[in-house]
Curated annotation (Swiss-Prot):
Sorted UniProt keywords: Membrane, Mitochondrion, Mitochondrion inner membrane
Protein's name in the database: Cytochrome c oxidase subunit 8B, mitochondrial
Role description: Component of the cytochrome c oxidase, the last enzyme in the mitochondrial electron transport chain which drives oxidative phosphorylation. The respiratory chain contains 3 multisubunit complexes succinate dehydrogenase (complex II, CII), ubiquinol-cytochrome c oxidoreductase (cytochrome b-c1 complex, complex III, CIII) and cytochrome c oxidase (complex IV, CIV), that cooperate to transfer electrons derived from NADH and succinate to molecular oxygen, creating an electrochemical gradient over the inner membrane that drives transmembrane transport and the ATP synthase.
Subunit structure: Component of the cytochrome c oxidase (complex IV, CIV), a multisubunit enzyme composed of 14 subunits. The complex is composed of a catalytic core of 3 subunits MT-CO1, MT-CO2 and MT-CO3, encoded in the mitochondrial DNA, and 11 supernumerary subunits COX4I, COX5A, COX5B, COX6A, COX6B, COX6C, COX7A, COX7B, COX7C, COX8 and NDUFA4, which are encoded in the nuclear genome.
GO biological process, one term: oxidative phosphorylation
Topological category with respect to the lipid bilayer: Single-pass membrane protein
A cellular-component GO term for this protein: mitochondrial inner membrane
Pathways involved: Energy metabolism; oxidative phosphorylation
Tissue/organ expression: Liver and heart specific isoform.
Compartments (UniProt record): Mitochondrion inner membrane
Domain of life of the native organism: Eukaryota
Assigned protein family: Belongs to the cytochrome c oxidase VIII family.
Amino acid sequence: ITAKPAKTPT
């Protein structure tokens, strides 16, 4: 499974 980078909520 390819882990996707967690996006930081603004």
